[in-house]
Amino acid sequence: MIRYKFPKAIFVACTASVMIVLAPAVNAQSTELKQVFAQLGATPVVRAQFEQQKKLASLNKIYVSKGTVLFSKNQGVLWQIQSPVKADLVVTPRKLVQKTQRTTSQIEVDKTPYGSVATMFLQLMSGNEAALAKNFNVVSANYSPMQWNVSLTPKSSLFKKLFVQVDAQGQRYVDRITILEQANNRTIIRFSQQTAQPQTLTAAENALFQLAK
């Protein structure tokens, strides 16, 4: 197995963004929170375009990356980054795999601190509400059929090292995620063209997920 250290900026932002999709389950006592969770968790496959803007306060510079994301409850999460470089990031319960045109690198989730983040998210996809309750406080949650928003702050020391607060908003799906990180850095991820179709994964998508089995 190839030992590989995944790029922190891409992995943290992507992982945080996929976690937020199921973060409304943190507080089972909140009616609005449960409504958000039920709405977002009702679809087994979601596809979307994404644009990530990462602002580094110390450099006063914004880095932009774009691509597509595929969320599958049965398989995992597939981020296909199209710019500024092309790469696929596959997250499954066992492995994290990054594939480029020239290389394929993988690491088992229990061999890296970030693996625990990915594992926790995948547990949430199967309905393990207790996992987020161990790591997040819900600052606010508002729901209506036309609009919802959720704000979270981390409990665990691991997440506190990564970010200060996560805000998400959307309608039927997640539309925007704002991650306030340490040192006043900020990552904004916007999702567009969200769709639940096609539900069936392509041969190429299945092949990528097989790399992380």
Regions found by a protein language model. Give the residues of each.
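Bacterial N-terminal signal peptides
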Residues: 12-21
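Short hydrophobic/aromatic-rich beta-strand segments that constitute the beta-sheet cores
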Residues: 50, 77-81, 96-99, 150-152, ...
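Generic beta-strand structural signal
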Residues: 71-72, 91, 99, 143, ...
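Acidic/charged, solvent-exposed loop-and-adjacent secondary-structure segments enriched in E/D, K/R, S/T
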Residues: 100-123
